[in-house]
């Protein structure tokens, strides 16, 4: 086992003990965004156990327990990829393609940017609402004055209603205090509002 993995410290948050600080921070971010999730609620058998003529003991089954289940999304938190994990990930992909083709697998390396990028594009399915502003007048500027009070069920619906064109990117969390305020920047990415 990798020394880096051995040094991962469990952390408790909101009454649940998580296997790492990254997992706890991910749970905090999802909770702050109001995204319902299940933590380590499933176990998948990637390869059944078997007996081998080359060793006395039975070879144990190879299993995988996703860190988070969010609707049809499996979310894995990995700060560092070990060689063992890289092999296991390939088996996870194979299992999902053959057994659960509708399930989406994502891996995140942090509880902020890569997490939100992993969830990008699934808002309509998850049924969340967003607030969107028109394009700022000055390139790169963000103005809170133009945030609409109308809520939309998807980024695409909001863009159509406001006659916005361009590629919509994922939402950025305003703060970890339960607020949900989003705004479009000049590149049509959703930028963090500084309060």
PLM features per residue range, with description:
Residues 160-174:
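Short, basic interhelical loop/turn and adjoining N-cap
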Residues 1-138, 150-157, 170, 183-195:
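Electrostatic, structured charged patches in enzyme active sites and in nucleic-acid/phosphate-binding
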Residues 178:
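Active-site activation/catalytic loop segments of kinase-like enzymes and analogous catalytic loops
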Residues 138-146:
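Acidic Ser/Thr/Pro-rich low-complexity disordered segments
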């Amino acid at each position: 086992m990798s020394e880096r993995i051995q040094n991962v410290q469990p952390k408790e948050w909101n009454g649940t003990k998580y296997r790492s600080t990254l997992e706890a921070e991910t749970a905090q971010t999802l909770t702050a965004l109001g995204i319902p999730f299940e933590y380590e609620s499933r176990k998948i058998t990637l390869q059944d156990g078997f007996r081998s003529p080359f060793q006395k003991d039975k070879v144990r089954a190879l299993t995988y327990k996703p860190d988070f289940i969010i609707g049809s999304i499996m979310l894995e938190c990995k700060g560092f990829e070990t060689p063992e994990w890289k092999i296991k990930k390939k088996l996870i992909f194979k299992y999902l393609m053959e057994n659960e083709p509708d399930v989406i697998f994502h891996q995140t390396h942090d509880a902020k940017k890569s997490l939100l990028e992993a969830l990008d594009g699934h808002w309509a399915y998850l049924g969340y609402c967003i607030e969107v502003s028109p394009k700022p007048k000055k390139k790169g500027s963000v103005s809170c004055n133009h945030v609409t009070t109308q809520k939309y069920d998807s980024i695409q619906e909001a863009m159509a209603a406001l006659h916005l064109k361009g590629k919509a990117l994922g939402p950025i969390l305003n703060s970890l205090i339960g607020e949900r305020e989003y705004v479009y920047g000049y590149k049509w990415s959703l930028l963090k509002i500084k309060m």
